[in-house]
Amino acid sequence: YVYCWSWAPKVQDVIDYNGLDNAEVSPYGRAMHCMELAFVLNNPDGYPELNGDPSKLPKNLLDSTRETWYAFAKTGNPCNDMIPEWKSYDSSDRYMMVITDDWKCMKDNRAEDTELLNAIAPYK
């Protein structure tokens, strides 16, 4: 199973909450590495420098992320009632769950990136 965490708070909200010197934001307003950990670990207070005001994090995303990682840890399959069907990844269809405020399982979502990486180190 492959996912792309694409949810990100508004940059200005993170700066307003933390101050410019303490905020960790993407200059492009995109999700950053490890941004999902507060959601996975159900710890909205865990990293406000990255996610902003914990009280403003989307509760539905906190709940669905926690439930999905729990299902995967328990069964080896992330599927549960809170998200759409998550199809497993294989080299022909390349399904990926794209996670924003909602969840979308997309086929070959990042084809250009995948082809570039495959040229360097083929998926087996």
Predicted regions and their residues:
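C-terminal helix-and-tail extensions that cap enzymatic domains
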Residues: 1-124
